[in-house]
Amino acid sequence: MTTPGPMEAAAMAGARWPVSVKGVLGWDGRIVVLRNHRGEWELPGGRLESADKSPQDALRREINEEIGLDAEIGPLVDSWIYDVEGKLVLILTYACEAPQPEALSHSDEHTDVRLVTPAELADAPIPSGYLSSVETALAGC
C-alpha cells in the first residue's frame, strides 16, 4: 500500500480547501507582480469571501484592493494546488485587462509591486504555478 500524497490525505480527512483567485495583468509584455510577507512574488488577487458572487467578482475586488485598478476579468487560464506552509490552497488564475496607470501602488498586504518580464520571473522567488499561469495566459490560453 502506498502512502497518500498531501492532496489525497486532505481529501480523505474531509478537508475543505481555501480558494484563491489570481490575475495575469500587464502591459507591453510586462506582468504585475506583488511581493508578499513571505518574500515571494505573486500575481494580484486573493481569497474568495462569502459576499463574492463569483470567482471573477472576487478577483475584481481583490485587484482593486491590492493595486487600485478596475480590471476586466477574462477567461480562466489555469488552476493548480499550492502548499502554503502545510496548507493546501486551490489557485484559479484568470487573464485580466485594465488601463495602464501612470504608476503602480500596492496595499499594506504586500511590500512591493513591480512590472516584470516573464524572463525576469524565471529567476525570482515565485511559486512555479504562477509561472505556468503567466506562460499560459501570454500564449492566449
Where are these regions (language model features)?
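Conserved hydrophobic "DFG−1" position in protein kinase catalytic cores
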Residues: L25, V33, C96-A98, L115
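A structural signal for short, well-ordered beta-strand segments
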Residues: G23, L76, Y94-C96
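Acidic, metal-coordinating catalytic segment for phosphate/diphosphate chemistry
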Residues: M1-K22
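NUDIX/MutT-family hydrolases
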Residues: A95, S105-A137
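A short coil-to-beta-strand element that immediately follows conserved catalytic motifs
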Residues: L69-S79
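Active-site-adjacent beta-strand/loop module that shapes the phosphate/pyrophosphate-binding cleft
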Residues: W80-A103
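Conserved Nudix-box catalytic region and its N-terminal flanking loop in Nudix hydrolases
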Residues: W27-E65
